[in-house]
Amino acid sequence: MARENKFGSSGGAKETPAGKLMETIVEDVIKAKAMPFAQWQALSANPLVPLAISVSQGGQYPVTQVGVDAAHMLSQQSWKSLEALRQTIDREAFMKLSFQAIGDTLRDCQSRLPEVPDGQNEQDVVLGDDFYAALVDDYQARLQQLAASASPDVDRHIPCHLFHSDQAVPAFAVGPVRFLPRAEWLDSFVKDSEVRELIHQVEARELDMEELTARSTVAESGRRASHALDVLRTLRHYSWVATIRMEGHEHARSHFKASVVVGLAIDAIGLRFQVEDARRFTKAGRQHLFAEDRFATTLDGRILRGSSVQMPGIGGRPGALAAKMAGEQSFLDAAGCILQHYVDGRRSGHALHLVERWANALYWVGEARREASDFMAVVNYGCAADGLSGAAGKASDMTSFAETALKPEGETVPEGVLTVDVAVHKVYREGRNKLAHGEMSGLLEDLAEPRAIGEALLPALFDVVTPVLADLLQNEQNLLKLDEKRAYRLLEAKLAARKANA
């Protein structure tokens, strides 16, 4: 697909009517068609990317940079106006589909041409606004059809590290995400018994990967070996697989959203564990755990060598984590309820503001816990505190929300014990604000204390807020009708009532 001229575009100027853009494209196609091939080809800065608009069944319409820019502008305006498609299609894929829809519209535009009156030549007929408006309608209909055909329903599978196999933790769900041990996932989703048998042979070391690779290249019988190879290369060394059904999404967008939602589900699980253990929950695509060699030489020439290895997944006394996970299912069900509302809302637009903020805050907490730098962890914890409380940067509102959720009623806090308001102050005002605004040094500073306070504050807030928000989503019928401020007042009232009844 040819690129637009960014510096020649109008940027944030008022949108050009779609009919005018279509007229520009049609006129430019006519202009380019009249050029000698060599002259048209020379217009492209990259000979491998010609200035052209492609058609579904092959072929293309030559254009100049003017036509390319008009097609890009029409595509961008369509992208901005179609929020539902923005949720289900990757932007780059959308642009390609839009160019294809323009090409198909040009190919079939003859049916839209006005009749030529008797005694007149075709060249004398003026194509008016009605003609271009009809082409825009055709383009939009074709775009929707192409988008639908490119957006199948699939189950997305993302390998994870959670619990060691000796813990015997059974499969479980966090809302729309199912977590299955590797063996159970293979039995559930690899439908071909011969493919499963090949995988089992490799895992039992009865067959090595080199032999399986060789079998996959055999013309007639290699298909099943090739499928087994695909599965094994995807699963690699992971012991769990997260599965989520993605309905009506283009493939790139489908994978991206699935990865985000699975990541949130893993972060929700991590809230029930200490930060050192939660960091070891990971999924394919996350690179925060690593092994490194450390090498130095002294001034007199001696070699100093060390290494560091961070292992994924957690274990313990055999079976202990199975019991713990059974005890945490109530919280995970509440988190799953919110996550399901997030996924549902994001199919065609936005989720409820309370749900969006909860999801964003959970992501920030997960990033803070994985972060190697105290500096960035404190910033992330501060962002999470702001987002979860709906304070919009107002520290007093943040403190009020946190105290409503966590401050004991009528109890005197012993001297020297960290209070909720001090925790918010240290994480947000003294931490996130000063770091983000450059008021204090960050990267190589010792920020272990504010990081530890953030680690204490945010999981405690999620522990209280998550079940209350889930209950509101399930039982408060008017929640969707409330604006954000009223919804937060209702949430705070429910948090206060919960604390009073505890």
Stretches found by the model and what they are:
Residues 2-155, 413-431, 438-502:
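Polyanionic, low-complexity intrinsically disordered segments
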Residues 25, 44-46, 55-58, 178, ...:
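Juxtamembrane/membrane-water interface recognition
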Residues 104-376, 383, 456-502:
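Charged, non-catalytic interaction/linker regions at domain boundaries
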Residues 352-361, 402, 429-439:
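Active-site-adjacent bridging/hinge elements
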Residues 380-418:
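Flexible secondary-structure boundary motifs
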